[in-house]
């Protein structure tokens, strides 16, 4: 349901027949059978009754979500933090990392995908203050990074892991 109470056709909004999105449940009691942070794969969409059927990733448990519950407590799960992605498998990953990213965090970011892992590496420009200002960042994009490191922990993240990077220009994605 949309916030206005109108029906939203999930299948059409996400692409007809596209039932492979994961969802996450938020802000509900920890003793509920469907737990906070569970990830689910949508297996069916019922647009007439405004509900979805889903299978929990990991153990295959099934549940149906509908109405206000679906609207208020379910979010798409294809954008998660690096830490939340640990132990998961995906088709591809895209991680936005800073020049202070640790080797361990980069390893987690660059290993969960079967096909490709891409890191978008940001670096502050000279003269910037401590406040984060996306318009003032340069964007660096790596190819397939190999999670092998020399021991230069003070060097930028792309040097520490031996990733191939090429500069795409200031504000290239903003």
From Swiss-Prot:
It comes from the Bacteria. InterPro entries: P-loop_NTPase (IPR027417). CDD domains: SF1_C_RecD. Gene3D superfamilies: P-loop containing nucleotide triphosphate hydrolases. This is Uncharacterized protein Mb2338. It comes from Mycobacterium bovis (strain ATCC BAA-935 / AF2122/97).
């Amino acid at each position: 349901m949309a916030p206005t109470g109108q029906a939203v056709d999930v299948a059409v909004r996400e692409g007809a027949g596209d039932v492979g999105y994961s969802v996450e449940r938020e802000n509900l009691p920890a003793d509920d059978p469907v737990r906070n942070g569970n990830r689910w794969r949508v297996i069916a969409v019922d647009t007439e009754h405004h509900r979805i059927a889903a299978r929990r990733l990991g153990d295959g448990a099934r549940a149906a979500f509908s109405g206000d519950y679906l609207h208020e407590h379910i979010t798409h799960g294809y954008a998660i933090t690096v830490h939340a992605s640990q132990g998961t498998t995906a088709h591809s990953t895209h991680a936005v990392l800073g020049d202070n990213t640790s080797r361990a965090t980069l390893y987690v970011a660059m290993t969960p995908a079967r096909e490709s892992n891409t890191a978008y590496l940001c670096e502050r420009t000279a003269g910037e203050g401590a406040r984060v200002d996306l318009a003032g960042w340069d964007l660096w994009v790596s190819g397939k990074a190999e999670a092998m490191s020399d021991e230069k922990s003070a060097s930028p993240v792309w040097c520490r892991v031996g990733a191939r990077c090429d500069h795409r220009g200031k504000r290239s994605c903003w």
